[in-house]
């Protein structure tokens, strides 16, 4: 298991990025900037989406400029050559920067955490639901501020975020995507209130 001596700090700055790397799959990326070796590092981000966003996005970066920095540097294990990650069914967290267009990881930007949300597109993700998950992610990063940046720490964050997604589903705020390539209802079958159905009598 690879690890680095980097720590999460409370002075982290979060940038949200939406990406549609494959026409049939809509993924969400969230890159978190933290201080590295005591120096704050900022990275402007860009918002991509198949549908028009209602709110203005963050600072725009030209695609060719992003691709120039998104390259593997061949660093050693001591320098982070073995990328840290957390992978669950709907949450993937990487220590590094992932280009939302090419999905290539920049191995030199080890001061960032990148969140990939629901890569299989199992749920429908309206803008407000994406923001809710982002807010929870920011909260979890702040909660674990100061902890060593290890795969164990990333798994704690990823597991908590996975439980939060399940909570949204059970509360009826999040819905399954019925156009998903595979419908296996990984978090339980949909629950329907009979009172919401037409021509159905509900006994008191």
Swiss-Prot record:
Name its GO BP terms in alphabetical order: NADH dehydrogenase complex (plastoquinone) assembly
Gene Ontology CC: one annotated term: chloroplast thylakoid membrane
Transit peptide located at which residues? 1-27
Under Enzyme Commission nomenclature, its number is 7.1.1.-
**Which stretches are annotated as coiled coil?**
none
Superkingdom of origin:
Eukaryota
Subcellular compartments:
Plastid, Chloroplast thylakoid membrane
GO MF, one example: oxidoreductase activity, acting on NAD(P)H, quinone or similar compound as acceptor
- List, alphabetically, the InterPro entries matched: NdhM
According to UniProt, the reaction catalysed is:
a plastoquinone + NADH + (n+1) H(+)(in) = a plastoquinol + NAD(+) + n H(+)(out); a plastoquinone + NADPH + (n+1) H(+)(in) = a plastoquinol + NADP(+) + n H(+)(out)
* Membrane topology recorded in Swiss-Prot or TrEMBL: Peripheral membrane protein
UniProt lists the family membership as follows:
Belongs to the NDH complex subunit M family.
Subunit record text = Part of the chloroplast NDH complex, composed of a mixture of chloroplast and nucleus encoded subunits. Component of the NDH subcomplex A, at least composed of ndhH, ndhI, ndhJ, ndhK, ndhL, ndhM, ndhN and ndhO.
PANTHER family given for it? NAD(P)H-QUINONE OXIDOREDUCTASE SUBUNIT M, CHLOROPLASTIC (PTHR36900:SF1)
Function noted in UniProt: NDH shuttles electrons from NAD(P)H:plastoquinone, via FMN and iron-sulfur (Fe-S) centers, to quinones in the photosynthetic chain and possibly in a chloroplast respiratory chain. The immediate electron acceptor for the enzyme in this species is believed to be plastoquinone. Couples the redox reaction to proton translocation, and thus conserves the redox energy in a proton gradient.
Q: What is this protein called?
A: NAD(P)H-quinone oxidoreductase subunit M, chloroplastic
Species of origin: Physcomitrium patens
């Amino acid at each position: 298991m690879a690890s680095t001596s980097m720590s999460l700090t409370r002075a982290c700055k979060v940038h949200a990025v939406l990406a549609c790397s494959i026409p049939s799959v809509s993924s969400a990326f969230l890159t978190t900037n933290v201080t590295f070796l005591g120096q704050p590092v900022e990275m402007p981000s860009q918002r991509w989406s198949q549908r028009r966003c209602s709110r203005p996005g963050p600072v725009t970066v030209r695609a060719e400029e992003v691709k120039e920095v998104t390259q593997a540097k061949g660093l050693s294990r001591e320098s982070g050559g073995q990328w840290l990650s957390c992978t669950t069914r709907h949450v993937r967290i990487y220590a590094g920067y992932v280009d939302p267009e090419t999905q290539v990881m920049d191995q030199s930007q080890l001061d960032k955490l990148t969140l990939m949300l629901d890569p299989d597109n199992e749920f429908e993700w309206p803008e407000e639901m994406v923001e809710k998950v982002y807010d929870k992610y920011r909260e979890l990063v702040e909660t674990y501020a100061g902890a060593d940046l290890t795969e164990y720490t990333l798994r704690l964050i990823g597991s908590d975020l996975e439980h939060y997604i399940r909570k949204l589903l059970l509360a009826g705020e999040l819905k399954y995507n019925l156009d998903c390539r595979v419908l296996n209802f990984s978090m339980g079958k949909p629950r329907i209130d009979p009172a919401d159905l037409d021509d159905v009598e509900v006994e008191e």
